[in-house]
């Protein structure tokens, strides 16, 4: 098969690892540290936001470094994969030897830095692999993002699936993640090439490019709804729906639908163009997810249907936007490192923003993680933040995309 000769499955596996690292940080880790160690949601939100501000400086620097790696590139990237694995073990499998909030900050910093460096190099390598062929970028994105979404599915279900099987489900997940990370790094080893251009990219040139700048702004606005819903998902399922224990299966439904839909959106984009297909998917996302506002406690089945429908639409976001940006980088910044440093920055900033704004608002309404006796205003606040805010933000993203001319 052509895909095997091009080693595209290696990209699928590595993308699965990276996405599997991201889900625990944003969805499981805050609740785990709040439930297990009694850490304040406000403190966790503030710390996550502070770490993301650190990323504002870190990601462009890591992109700058990535474009200047030469002979040692393979070794440095592989060592970074070790850091990613060890940081996950530290976060979930080792009891904090210091104050839990500071241990959380230390291990998450290791995860953030390793994740950022690996992601930047991974997506930049995709730019050079696909070249300037528009169909090549969309095709690679389909393999890559399908792997990413499958990785999220596994990361979503394993911790809850291991309850009753493993003494410490999150520790078992962390050790399993570390092993898979090293396997994926082994298969990606031959893919890490030196930079494709002798002249490293200048970040100013990327920002000054009209199309690249518009895509970055669109990514920032469009990623925020998913950041909001991801941050509050566990709390919504447990406290609003009263469906504790269903978190893993529901997450799997959402991301599996996204993974299955990803090649379909990719094929549609090759035929009809990325922009009209993406607009269609975003409109369908609002139509499906908006129904969440009408749910009552016990409505697990209707919510499962919403997870499938909205997950299928998210597959377009996660496949087409990175492909559009990579296609532009192939023209103005062939090395890709600086560009995807910026891309990482805007996407991760939305998660930080969601944490620092939403978690304190939730706590001030009287919400206490794990409590079975919450005041009505806490449930109302949770519902509005989880269901209404993402829908409004998605409408803003749709308006922006419609009004934006992305073609040169």
Residue ranges and their predicted role:
Residues 2-408:
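Membrane-embedded alpha-helical bundles of multi-pass transporters/translocases
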């Amino acid at each position: 098969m052509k895909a095997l000769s091009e080693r595209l499955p290696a990209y699928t596996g590595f993308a699965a690892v990276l996405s599997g690292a991201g889900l625990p940080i944003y969805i499981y880790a805050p609740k785990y540290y709040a439930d297990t160690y009694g850490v304040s949601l406000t403190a966790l939100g503030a710390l996550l936001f502070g770490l993301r501000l650190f990323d504002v400086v870190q990601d462009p620097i890591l992109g700058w470094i990535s474009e200047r790696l030469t002979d040692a590139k393979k070794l440095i990237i592989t060592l970074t994969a070790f850091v990613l694995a060890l940081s996950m073990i530290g976060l979930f499998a080792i009891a904090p030897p210091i104050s839990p909030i500071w241990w959380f900050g230390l291990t998450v910093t290791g995860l953030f830095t390793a994740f950022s460096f690996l992601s930047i190099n991974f997506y930049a390598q995709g730019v050079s692999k696909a070249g300037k062929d528009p169909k090549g970028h969309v095709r690679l994105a389909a393999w890559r993002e399908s792997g990413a979404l499958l990785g999220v599915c596994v990361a979503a279900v394993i911790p809850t699936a291991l309850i009753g099987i493993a003494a410490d489900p999150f520790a078992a997940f962390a050790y399993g993640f570390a092993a898979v990370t090293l396997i994926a790094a082994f298969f990606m080893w031959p893919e890490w090439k030196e930079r494709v251009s002798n002249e490293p990219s200048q970040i100013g040139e990327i920002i000054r490019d009209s199309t690249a700048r518009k895509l970055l702004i669109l990514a920032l606005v469009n990623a925020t709804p998913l950041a909001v819903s991801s941050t509050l998902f566990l709390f919504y399922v447990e406290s609003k729906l009263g469906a504790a224990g269903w978190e893993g299966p529901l997450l799997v439904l959402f991301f599996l639908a996204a993974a299955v839909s990803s090649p379909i959106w990719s094929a549609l984009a090759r035929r009809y163009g990325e922009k009209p297909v993406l607009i269609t998917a975003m409109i369908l996302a609002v139509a499906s997810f908006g129904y969440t506002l009408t749910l009552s406690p016990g409505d697990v089945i209707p919510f499962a249907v919403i997870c499938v429908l909205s997950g299928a639409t998210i597959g377009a976001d996660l496949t087409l936007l990175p492909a559009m940006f990579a296609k532009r980088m192939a023209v103005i910044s062939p090395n890709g490192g600086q560009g995807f440093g910026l891309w990482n920055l805007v996407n991760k900033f939305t998660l930080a923003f969601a944490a620092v704004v939403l978690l304190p608002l939730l706590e001030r309404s009287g919400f206490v993680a794990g409590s079975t006796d919450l005041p009505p205003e806490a449930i109302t606040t949770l519902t509005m933040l989880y269901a209404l805010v993402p829908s409004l933000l998605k409408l803003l993203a749709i308006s922006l995309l419609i009004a934006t001319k992305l073609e040169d």
